[in-house]
Amino acid sequence: MQIVQKTNGRSMKRVLLSSALLLVSTLTFAQSKVSGTVKDANGDPLIGVSVMEVGTNNGAVTDINGNYTLNVKPGAKLKLSYIGFTPQTVKAGSNSQIVLQEDNTALNEVVVVGYGTMRRKDVTSSITTVKAEDLNQGVFTDPGQMLQGKVPGLVVSSTADPNGSPTITLRGASTLRTGAMSPYYVVDGIPGVDISIVSPEDIESIDVLRDATATAIYGSKAANGVIIITTKKGSKERTNVTYNGYVAIDNILKKYDVCTADDLRQYAKDNNITLKDGGANTDWQDEVLRTGISHNHNVNISGGNGSTNYMVSADLRKREGVIKMTGFDRFNVRSLVSTKTLKDHLTISIGANMMYGKHFGVPSGNEGASVLDAMNYYSPTNAVKNADGTWTVGSGSKNYNPLALMEENKSETVWKRNQFVGKTALELWKGLVWNVNYSWSNYQSTYSAYNTRNSQLEGIGNKNGQATRNTYFGREQTFETYLNYNFTAGKNKFDLMAGYSWEEKKNNDGFGLSVEGYYNDDLGWYNMSYAQTILGVQNSVQSGYLEKVRNISFYGRVNYSFDSRYMLQATIRRDGSSVFGKNNRWGTFPSVSAAWNITEEKFMQNQHIFDNLKLRAGYGISGNTMGFDVYSSYNTYGASGTFVYDGKTYRTYGATKNANPDLKWESTGMLNIGLDFAFLKGRLNGTVEVYHKKTKDLIWSYPVSTTQYIYGWMDANVGEMTNKGIEFTLNAVPVRAKNFMWSTTLNLSHNKNTVDKMQNETFHTTNLTQGDPMVAGVSADGWTQRIMEGEPIGTFYTYQYAGTVNGRSEYYVLDENGNRTGETTNNPSLKDRSITGCAQPKLNAGWNNTLTYKNWSLNAFITGVFGNDIYNSPRAHYTAAQMFSDGKNVLKEFLSNPVGDASSSLPSDRYIEKGSYVRLQTLSLSYTFRNCFNDWIQDLTLYGTANNLFTITSYKGLDPEVNMGGIDPGIDYRWSRYPHTRTFMVGVKINFGGSKKK
């Protein structure tokens, strides 16, 4: 028995040993070695092709000869991927010679144009498309901020003010009217939409139409360029729920280096000066500033079936400003349902959008009544409050305690906006589609402000509380119908479009009221009936004047392509508007452009350098009606003052505008020439563009004789302006390895602006002075810029600083030709001014880099501005001798200035500084978990983003990114410029895949 058991034990060991050897042998032979060569259609080897075993992380990369070797399991499949080529999946070992075909996705991608779409390959105009994943990341409230640095020629001056909007200029200023330089926005085919109704998280892509051949189809609204926003749509395959949320903190980038209380005391002691000393040592910047906390939550639900799809999104965002008591809350809802019927010949879409926002602000007026100003000038020797709990008060006038400004003068603005959209597209027969779009929207804004009985504002503190509320309404309607017809005849391809548009806007319907005399401050602006007095007739009741504007348009476009080699496009739009004079209600805006796909020619078929080479050229005319109301060309009358009769105050009325029946829109003609190129199988591609933009009939208000006209000024079309420049874009994939890729994009732009004409035989003005920063010690002629014929907007025209002589700032004396006489003076005259700088940059740059390794992604985005000047008015103001003598704080730089230098702050090149800078605008790191959870979560992405990490600049102010819009660019205004911030945010994006439709 025991022998049997022993024998069985030995047998078992042999069996186990044999099994182990068999298993090892099996595993060894299960990994078979496969090899092959990857080439392109021309037989050239492809280097760096990713060869991956499907369903595993096992892979290899082709060598310099296109060869690869890989150990794979039996029956495995290989996926081959290479930039610029269509991915291909093959059975391992089935073919040692693999040919990858070029991927024409980039050329065949759809580009959104006015009233339609086109293949990128067929585009003859200048259009830049930015996908959602390529937009700037950060705590943004405006889609314009997401484009900063992404589009050549598009200059975006951002702001950290949670209640502010960026200024946007495309290819230079085209008007002299402030507020009329912004591009025209189109959202999902609906023109003129207020983009506050669009949540940044809902954006699918943004197309920027940059030249007149692309924008002319929008006629009189398109001189400043057109930005087309496409939002996300529903899905037909499955119900998708996506959540995207983040939390962020903001801190100020830099503080002014103002004096401490001890600095002021030491300065007064050293110079035997009496100091108005409150006995404290307060850091007012610390008292006013805070770390702003923001959060955003966006939920997007989409789904559908074969004929119907839907999308609903809700977006809740809250942002605190770095100035205490500033911020906003906003809630957006967006919905869209689309369905196809009549055997898919009819598509009907219905959408509804809503926005509710509440903005909180603090005083930001000039003349010292601004928290942004007071936190720098209010003396650090003053305490926050007196011993009895009341606010400390600065000596003299316009010397406000910044915390008192905030706490005792509160305001908020509530915005409500609704939009309803209906769209139909009926295919009448193959290639012919009839589109009908209708949009209706309304808005309401309500402003509320309350000044308590403790307010330090002049004329307010003795009112026992003053409340102001006003509310205004507006409604807009847009109806458009157009036909698209495309067909092919042999090698000839046609795409025709013709349409009609009708718009109506009713704005400014509202009123306001101010009251005073409350029993206490508990109610604020609520229950205004409790106040004792309605303010006097001069400023008590505010009333809007209802205006109705109508625009009617007819438009058309022809696109022709022969054999994908030669393309021609012609557009025309005829616009009529009620805002202009009766003699010029209608205008025509044509354009024509052509393109030559050189690489499609037979003589290019055997070359191996260019993958794409296309030459484009075009000329078009577009207009500018922004900033006009229904009364722009009419005589108008309004309240012009008051008079007292029999002890009562009455209004007086007088003329406020002259009629001009010849007033018409400004028109901009633009010539654009572009070259598109691609090398190395698409790994290197880009565009070079040159343009010449001429704007005529610039509108300005000119002085006229009151013996001939009822009012002393008249709006007229007189001026001319030119912008010309060059733009360059380069996209590249320098590294593409097994699990790693580096992609980069560089864009550069240069624009030269010139004011060509400002007067004619009827209307005269030699120059226009602009940009008065209201600096202490400058009682008159504080302006710093002049608009002149032959010079660009933003030309600084100041005195030339000569240094300090005997404790006084001296300036060069100029002769009648503007040359220095060799003499200096501390009391210069206007003739001693000259051109001393220019705010226009010579170069704008944006450089984006994305590195991906497996599921990791790192993005770094750098922006730069070069060759511009900035007028540092805060430095001029906070170093003025008058500031110290008035008991206000100053910069530490002041301590080294001569005592009592009364002329130090005059507008001069002493305060004009180089504004060039390079900034790491965005650094973002993310990790995506894919298919790591159950069927209900497709992927989850964790990300962290930092904005404005560092800036390289020689500018001495807070930040070199000053406002570059308007007609006074490049001036650093102290009282209205919200400080820029450094932002850190962390977020998560979860895609709940849901279940597929059966």
Question: Could you say what each language-model-derived stretch is?
Answer:
Residues 922-952, 967:
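C-terminal structured "cap/appendage" subdomains that terminate the fold
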Residues 245, 314-320, 568-577, 617-619, ...:
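Transmembrane beta-strand segments that form the barrel wall of outer-membrane beta-barrel proteins
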Residues 231, 260, 299-303, 335-339, ...:
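Residues on the lipid-exposed face of transmembrane beta-strands in outer-membrane beta-barrel proteins
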Residues 235-281, 322-324, 332-419, 435-552, ...:
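Surface-exposed loop/interface segments of Gram-negative outer-membrane beta-barrel transport/assembly proteins
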Residues 842-867, 911-931:
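C-terminal substrate/ligand-recognition segments
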Residues 323-324, 578-583:
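Solvent-exposed loop/turn segments connecting transmembrane beta-strands
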Residues 1-335, 340-341, 346-355, 392, ...:
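Short, small/polar-rich motifs associated with maturation and membrane association
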Residues 328-340, 585-595, 940-950:
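Short secondary-structure subsegments characteristic of cysteine-rich extracellular domains
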